[in-house]
């Protein structure tokens, strides 16, 4: 089905539910707007109505209008959803409100992925390090869009502090976005442009994870931070932001949390004191126990079946 651009979101959804059914379930991933989605779904007799939370902030300014909107959407979600899901406890509480986990309708459903795909690969490590001349370097890695949320401005300052203590340090950034040129210019201003690699978007991210020695991710907010889980599956220690990144992300015991407001030198110390990366696959097995895509898919199917009163 497609949505007619001349209709509103509400009109399009109502039209699809009315003319395209019957539907057994509506599973909404549009944050607070899920309040509208599950309300329309209930009005059209959809028996299973799921609201799913994926973040802990949007970086928005909290005006009175915004607070009123979120209050109303929460009311609609609680009144009309049959199940509340989130990628972390923090994400659930951000969208559904504090104390939501006490309700039997609310639970965490991890973002499953093919964990085996992200295992450490010695050949991939050698190839990427050779491609960029990193054979003898201490490689600090980062994977993320060059947008405000990922906080590259502080990342580059933190790496400058690392450079002051590790002459062999190199920063390997995977991703692209609207702030890339600004961050590239900032690296030149800090005098470290020759020690920063902007690799752009890459399809073979496991090889890039394998090329890294530690993972630095000072994000401003995250529902979970999937790249942090991928990096741990690859055997990396991850250094990320205290409070705004959920503690759920520490799957392997290889996550260190630093306050966002801490000076760059504090972040540098966390990176430089991080345990050496693993290469034997133990971390991948630990991650797989929670995030294996097949297991997560089976859990979601079980939720659908339970909500529908059983599957045939």
Where are these regions (language model features)?
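A charged, aromatic-enriched C-terminal amphipathic alpha-helix characteristic of glycosyltransferases
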Residues: 278-312
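A short helix/loop element that forms part of the nucleotide-sugar donor recognition site in Leloir-type
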Residues: 13-14, 119-133
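Short His-centered aromatic/hydrophobic patch
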Residues: 28-34, 53
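Short hydrophobic beta-strand element within catalytic cores of glycosyltransferases
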Residues: 228, 237-241, 247
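A short, active-site helix/loop in glycosyltransferases that binds the activated sugar's phosphate group
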Residues: 79-119
């Amino acid at each position: 089905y497609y949505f007619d651009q001349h209709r509103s979101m509400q009109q399009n959804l109502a039209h699809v539910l009315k003319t395209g059914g019957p539907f057994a379930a509506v599973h909404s991933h549009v944050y607070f707007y899920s309040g509208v989605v599950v309300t329309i779904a209930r009005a059209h007799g959809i028996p299973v109505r799921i609201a799913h939370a994926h973040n802990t902030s949007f970086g928005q300014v909290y005006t009175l209008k915004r607070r009123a909107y979120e209050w109303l959407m929460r009311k609609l979600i609680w009144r009309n959803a049959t199940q509340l899901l989130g990628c972390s406890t923090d994400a659930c509480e951000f969208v559904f409100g504090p104390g939501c986990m006490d309700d039997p309708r609310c639970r965490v459903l991890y973002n499953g992925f093919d964990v085996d795909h992200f295992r450490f690969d010695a050949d991939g490590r050698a190839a990427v390090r050779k491609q960029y001349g990193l054979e003898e370097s201490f490689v600090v890695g980062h994977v993320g869009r060059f947008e405000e949320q990922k906080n590259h401005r502080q990342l580059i300052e933190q790496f400058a502090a690392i450079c002051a203590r590790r002459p062999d340090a190199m920063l390997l950034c995977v991703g692209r976005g609207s702030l890339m040129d600004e961050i590239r210019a900032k690296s030149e201003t800090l005098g470290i442009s020759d020690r920063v690699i902007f690799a752009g978007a890459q399809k073979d991210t496991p090889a890039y994870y394998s090329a890294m020695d530690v993972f630095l991710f000072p994000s401003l907010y995250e529902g979970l931070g999937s790249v942090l889980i991928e990096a741990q599956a690859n055997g990396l220690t991850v250094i990320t932001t205290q409070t705004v990144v959920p503690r759920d992300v520490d799957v392997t015991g290889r996550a260190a949390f630093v306050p966002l407001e801490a000076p760059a030198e504090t972040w540098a110390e966390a990176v430089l004191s991080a345990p050496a990366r693993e290469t034997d696959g133990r971390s991948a097995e630990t991650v797989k126990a929670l995030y294996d895509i097949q297991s997560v898919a089976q859990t979601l199917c079980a939720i659908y079946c339970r909500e529908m009163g059983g599957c045939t």
